[in-house]
Curated annotation (Swiss-Prot):
GO cellular component, one term: plasma membrane
Protein name: ATP synthase subunit delta
Keyword Transport: yes
Designated gene of the protein: atpH
Subunit text: F-type ATPases have 2 components, F(1) - the catalytic core - and F(0) - the membrane proton channel. F(1) has five subunits: alpha(3), beta(3), gamma(1), delta(1), epsilon(1). F(0) has three main subunits: a(1), b(2) and c(10-14). The alpha and beta chains form an alternating ring which encloses part of the gamma chain. F(1) is attached to F(0) by a central stalk formed by the gamma and epsilon chains, while a peripheral stalk is formed by the delta and b chains.
Length: 175
């Protein structure tokens, strides 16, 4: 996985620089997400590994209908370099670069029960204050947390779940 990320990084940066120059973060993000989704399909991955598949055919297979010429050239470069299987990593890195440029933190909030609108707003406000950035939150429910929530925002994980507190208490008592 780390090798794939290392190989994908320069392509993600190049795509990001191009999108920034074109002022087209959203279209590039959408196109990369589409291409990554298609490339991740096992049947398509097998087809992309076939040396008889031409560059133009690979680009036609992976490019969304509403893409620009620059995006087609980007896919062609990936095809020529045999890097099309890296599209999921490239897409993820592009989105991370975009979020950083737009001063947005993406946070995943996993709670033991469904959060109310007020609770979610309070979490967003606290995260906005902590990171001094806009916050995009996705939520999930995991009953095994027993109570509370786990917030994963970038490099920061805040475990306020009862399951986490019990695990820390057990570790403290064992020492």
């Amino acid at each position: 996985m780390s090798q794939a990320l290392t190989l994908a990084r320069p392509y993600a940066r190049a795509a990001f620089a191009t999108a920034r120059d074109e002022g087209a973060f959203a279209p590039w993000s959408d196109a990369l997400a589409f291409s990554a989704h298609v490339a991740a399909d096992p049947r398509v991955a097998a087809l992309l590994a076939n040396p008889e598949l031409g560059r133009d055919d690979a680009v036609a297979l992976l490019a969304p209908v509403t893409h620009g010429e620059t995006y087609s050239r980007f896919l062609a470069i990936l095809a020529e370099s045999h890097r099309l299987p890296l599209l999921p990593e490239i897409s993820g890195m592009f989105d991370a670069l975009r979020a950083d440029a737009e001063h947005v933190v993406k946070a995943n909030v996993t709670s033991a029960a469904e959060l109310s609108a007020g609770e979610l707003d309070a979490i967003k406000t606290a995260l906005r204050k902590r990171f001094n950035r806009e916050v995009e939150v996705t939520t999930a429910v995991d009953a095994s947390l027993i109570g509370g929530a786990v917030i994963d925002a970038g490099d920061v994980v805040i475990d306020g779940s009862l399951k986490g507190k019990l695990a820390r208490l057990q570790t403290a008592l064992a020492n």
